[in-house]
C-alpha cells in the first residue's frame, strides 16, 4: 500500500470554518441562549427516518449510484456475465444496493487500524484502486463509528471529509491531524510550558461551562483534550465547533460523503454494569436519540441543552445552542477512556503528583461524574415509549451516556440494522481487543445477534453467527467472513437483515494488536498500523486471494439479486463457498478469549441467553433460532433520576489537572 500522494487540499476545514453561524453562539465551549420559533417541537417519535435524513438521502443516492456502479464494474470485470449490473443500476433506483461501513471501538488501535481499512476502500488513497477496494467508501451511504472508531469517522467527517491519505501526507506539518506522538496527558512532551498552557485552557473551558449553569463531568475534560488531536487547525482544538456545524458544510449538504453516525449507551448512575438491554443512543448531524423501545424518540442535536417538556422549550421561543460541542459528543462515545485518566498512577508522573490527582479523580468517578451528562434531559416527558417499556429515561432530569461499547457491542451495528435504513450489506470493521493478545474474537457480532432476542430487540434482525470459540477455532477472526449470505435461511427473523462482511484486525506487515490504553504512537507506528489495516481489509493487497475484490462485489449485490430472483454470477458461488460462514460450529473451549476493555458484563437474562448463537445457529438458519417467543420480554435497564452531582469535587480536579501538567 502506498500512502504518499497528497490527494486532497491541506485546507480541509475551509468550507466548515466559513459557516460560523453554525458554531457555538459564543464561539466558545459555553452553550448560549438563542431565539427559536415559538411553536418549535424538538422531539419526534422514532417511527421512521427524519425528514432531513430522507431529503439528504436523495442527494447521496445520486453520488453512490455512480460510485458503486463504477466499483462493481471493476470488481466483476473478470466475471463471465455481468448483465445483473444493468438491472441494479437502471432506471429503478430501488434496485440499487445500499451499503454501510461500521468502525469498531478500541482506542487509537481502532482509529489507526480502522483508518487503514477505510483507506483501502477510498479511491483517494494511492494504490486503493489497483490493490484495494477503492471506491467502496464513495459508494457507502452510512458510516458509523464507536469510541476509537468514532475518533476515526468524526475526524474525517468534521474535517470537511478529508481522507486518511491526506492525514498521512501531512504528518510532518505543524498542527497535523492525529499527532499522537505524545500522550494526551502530556501533548507537548517535555515542553512543560505548552502542556501546562493547554491544560489551563481546558480547565478554563470546562469551568466556564459550569459557571454558565450547566452540569459538567470528566467527559468534558476528555472531549476538550481529544479535540486538539482531531481538529488541530481550529482555535484551541475547535473550542466552539459544534456537531450540527456539519449540516452547513457543502460536502455534507450536497451528499458527497456518507452519513456519519456515532453510538453511545445509556447508563444508570451509581452502577457500572451496562448490559445488552441498555438503551442505545445514536448521534447524527441532524438528531440524537434512540430506536429502542425504552425511548423511541429523537431530538434536534443542534438544540441540546434546551430545557424542554415533551419537546417544547419551557421558555417559549428560547433555546440553547452550542451544547453539541464536537469534542464533547466524540468523548461521549469513548468515555471508557475516563478510566485512563483515572489511572494516572500508572503513568510517568512523579508519584506524589499522580497520587494527588488520582484521589480527586477517584472521588469524581465515585460520584458518577465520569460519564457524559446531558442536562437538562432533552427527552423529559417525551412519551413515545413502546408498549411495556420502562419510563425512567423520560422521568429523569438528566440523561447519562457512556462509551458505546460498554454493552460489549463494540461494532456500531444497531443503527445500521434499522429496517427504515434499507441497507443490503454492512462492512463491519472489528478492531476490538477481545483476546488476551488484543485481537478480536467476534464477540461484538455475537452480542448484537443476541440483542435481537432481548427486550430492546423487538424490531431488530441480525443474521446467525457462531459463538466466540467457533470464531477462533475456525479462524473466522483472522480473515474476512460473510454472514447471512442466503436470505432464504433468514425468514424466521423479524425481517431480512443486511448481509454482514466481517473484517477483523489481523497481522500482516505490523503487529496491529496494540493495547487499547496505548496512548502514544510514533510516526512509524502510526503508518505501520494504517498499512496493516489496509492489508487486513484486502487479504494482503489481494496477495492472499486475487479473487477477493470480486467476492466483495458478490456480497454487495447478493441481497438485491435474491430480491429480484435474478441469476447469480457463477463466480459468486465459489466466493460464497470461500467466505460465507456455512453454519459449522466448533465450540471447543479456547483460552484467552471472551475478554474486552470494559469492566461491565454485557448479558441478557437466562431465557435470552438460551437463544445465543452457540446454541441456535449450528445450521445456516434453524427455525428454532428465530427467537420469536423471546421478543415480548419486558424492557431492560434504563436511566433514572439522579441529581446529586458533586460538582465541587470536579472544580478541585480541574485545578489539580492544570497544576499536574504544569509540573511535568
UniProtKB/Swiss-Prot annotation:
Propeptide segments, given as residue ranges: 635-664
One family name in Pfam for this protein: PLA2_B
Known glycosylation sites: 26, 33, 52, 78, 92, 123, 160, 170, 215, 277, 307, 345, 388, 459, 489, 513, 541, 565, 582
Domain PLA2c residue range list: 35-586
InterPro entries, sorted: Acyl_Trfase/lysoPLipase, LysoPLipase_cat_dom
Enzyme class: hydrolase
Keyword terms: Cell membrane, Glycoprotein, GPI-anchor, Hydrolase, Lipid degradation, Lipid metabolism, Lipoprotein, Membrane, Signal
Subcellular location: Cell membrane
Bilayer topology: Lipid-anchor; GPI-anchor
Gene Ontology terms, MF aspect: lysophospholipase activity; phospholipase A2 activity
Domain of life of the native organism: Eukaryota
Cellular compartments per GO CC: cell periphery; cytosol; endoplasmic reticulum; extracellular region; periplasmic space; plasma membrane; side of membrane
Keyword Signal annotated: yes
UniProt-listed GO biological process terms: glycerophospholipid catabolic process; glycerophospholipid metabolic process; phosphatidylcholine acyl-chain remodeling
Principal location listed in the UniProt entry: membrane
Gene3D superfamilies linked to this entry: Cytosolic phospholipase A2 catalytic domain (3.40.1090.10)
Protein's job: Sequentially removes both fatty acyl groups from diacylglycerophospholipids and therefore has both phospholipase B and lysophospholipase activities. It also displays transacylase activity. Substrate preference is phosphatidylserine > phosphatidylinositol >> phosphatidylcholine > phosphatidylethanolamine. The substrate specificity is pH- and ion-dependent. In contrast with activities observed at optimum pH 3.5, the order of substrate preference at pH 5.5 is phosphatidylcholine = phosphatidylethanolamine >> phosphatidylinositol.
Family statement: Belongs to the lysophospholipase family.
Name by which UniProt lists this protein: Lysophospholipase 1
Amino acid at each position: 500500500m502506498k500512502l504518499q500522494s497528497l490527494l486532497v487540499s491541506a485546507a480541509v476545514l475551509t468550507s466548515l470554518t466559513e459557516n460560523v453561524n453554525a458554531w457555538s453562539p459564543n464561539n466558545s465551549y459555553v452553550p448560549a441562549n438563542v431565539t427559536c420559533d415559538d411553536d418549535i417541537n424538538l422531539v419526534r417519535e422514532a417511527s421512521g427516518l427524519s425528514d432531513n435524513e430522507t431529503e439528504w438521502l436523495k442527494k447521496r443516492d445520486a453520488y453512490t449510484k455512480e460510485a458503486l456502479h463504477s466499483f462493481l464494474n471493476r470488481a466483476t470485470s473478470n466475471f463471465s456475465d455481468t448483465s445483473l449490473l444493468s438491472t441494479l443500476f437502471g432506471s429503478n433506483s430501488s434496485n440499487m444496493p445500499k451499503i454501510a461501513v461500521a468502525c469498531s471501538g478500541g482506542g487509537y488501535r481502532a482509529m489507526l487500524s480502522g483508518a487503514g481499512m477505510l483507506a483501502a476502500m477510498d479511491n483517494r488513497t494511492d494504490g486503493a484502486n489497483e490493490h484495494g477496494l477503492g471506491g467502496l467508501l464513495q459508494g457507502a451511504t452510512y458510516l458509523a463509528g464507536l469510541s476509537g472508531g468514532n475518533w476515526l469517522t468524526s475526524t474525517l467527517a468534521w474535517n470537511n471529509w478529508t481522507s486518511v491519505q491526506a492525514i498521512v501526507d501531512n504528518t510532518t506539518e505543524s498542527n497535523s491531524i492525529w499527532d499522537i506522538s505524545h500522550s494526551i496527558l502530556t501533548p507537548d512532551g517535555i515542553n512543560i510550558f505548552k502542556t501546562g498552557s493547554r491544560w489551563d485552557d481546558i480547565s478554563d473551558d470546562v469551568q466556564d461551562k459550569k459557571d454558565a449553569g450547566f452540569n459538567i463531568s470528566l467527559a468534558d475534560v476528555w472531549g476538550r483534550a481529544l479535540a486538539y488531536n482531531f481538529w488541530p487547525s481550529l482555535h484551541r482544538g475547535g473550542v466552539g465547533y459544534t456537531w450540527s456545524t456539519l449540516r452547513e458544510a457543502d460536502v455534507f449538504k450536497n451528499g458527497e460523503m456518507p452519513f456519519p453516525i456515532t453510538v453511545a449507551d445509556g447508563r444508570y448512575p451509581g452502577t457500572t454494569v451496562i448490559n445488552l438491554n441498555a438503551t442505545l443512543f445514536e448521534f447524527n448531524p441532524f438528531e440524537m436519540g434512540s430506536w429502542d423501545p425504552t425511548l423511541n424518540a429523537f431530538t434536534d442535536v443542534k438544540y441540546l441543552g434546551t430545557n424542554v417538556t415533551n419537546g417544547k422549550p419551557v421558555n417559549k421561543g428560547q433555546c440553547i445552542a452550542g451544547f453539541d460541542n464536537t469534542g464533547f459528543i466524540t468523548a461521549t462515545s469513548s468515555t471508557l477512556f475516563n478510566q485512563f485518566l483515572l489511572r494516572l498512577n500508572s503513568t510517568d508522573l512523579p508519584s506524589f503528583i499522580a497520587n494527588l490527582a488520582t484521589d480527586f479523580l477517584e472521588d469524581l468517578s465515585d460520584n458518577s461524574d465520569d460519564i457524559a451528562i446531558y442536562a437538562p434531559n432533552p427527552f423529559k416527558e417525551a412519551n413515545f415509549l413502546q408498549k411495556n417499556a420502562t419510563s425512567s429515561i423520560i422521568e429523569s432530569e438528566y440523561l447519562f451516556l457512556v462509551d458505546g461499547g460498554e454493552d460489549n457491542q463494540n461494532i456500531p451495528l444497531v443503527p445500521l440494522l434499522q429496517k427504515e435504513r434499507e441497507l443490503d450489506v454492512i462492512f463491519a470493521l472489528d478492531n476490538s481487543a477481545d483476546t488476551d493478545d488484543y485481537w478480536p474474537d467476534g464477540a461484538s457480532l455475537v452480542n448484537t445477534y443476541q440483542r435481537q432476542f432481548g427486550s430492546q430487540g423487538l424490531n431488530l434482525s441480525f443474521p446467525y453467527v457462531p459463538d466466540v470459540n467457533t470464531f477462533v477455532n475456525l479462524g473466522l477472526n483472522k480473515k474476512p467472513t460473510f454472514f447471512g449470505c442466503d436470505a432464504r435461511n433468514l425468514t424466521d427473523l423479524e425481517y431480512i437483515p443486511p448481509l454482514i462482511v466481517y473484517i477483523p484486525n489481523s497481522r500482516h506487515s505490523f503487529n496491529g494488536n496494540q493495547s487499547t490504553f496505548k496512548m502514544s504512537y510514533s510516526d512509524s507506528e502510526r503508518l505501520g498500523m494504517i498499512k496493516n489495516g489496509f492489508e487486513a481489509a484486502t487479504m494482503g493487497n489481494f496477495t492472499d486471494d486475487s479473487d477477493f475484490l470480486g467476492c466483495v462485489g458478490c456480497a454487495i449485490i447478493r441481497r438485491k439479486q435474491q430480491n429480484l430472483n435474478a441469476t447469480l454470477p457463477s463466480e459468486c458461488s465459489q466466493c460464497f463457498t470461500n467466505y460465507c460462514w456455512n453454519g459449522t460450529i466448533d465450540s471447543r473451549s479456547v483460552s484467552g478469549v471472551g475478554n474486552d476493555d470494559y469492566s461491565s458484563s454485557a448479558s441478557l437474562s437466562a431465557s435470552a441467553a438460551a437463544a445465543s448463537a452457540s446454541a441456535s445457529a449450528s445450521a445456516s438458519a434453524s427455525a428454532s433460532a428465530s427467537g420469536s417467543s423471546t421478543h415480548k420480554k419486558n424492557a431492560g435497564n434504563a436511566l433514572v433520576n439522579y441529581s446529586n452531582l458533586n460538582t465541587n469535587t470536579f472544580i478541585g480536579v480541574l485545578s489539580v489537572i492544570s497544576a499536574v501538567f504544569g509540573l511535568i
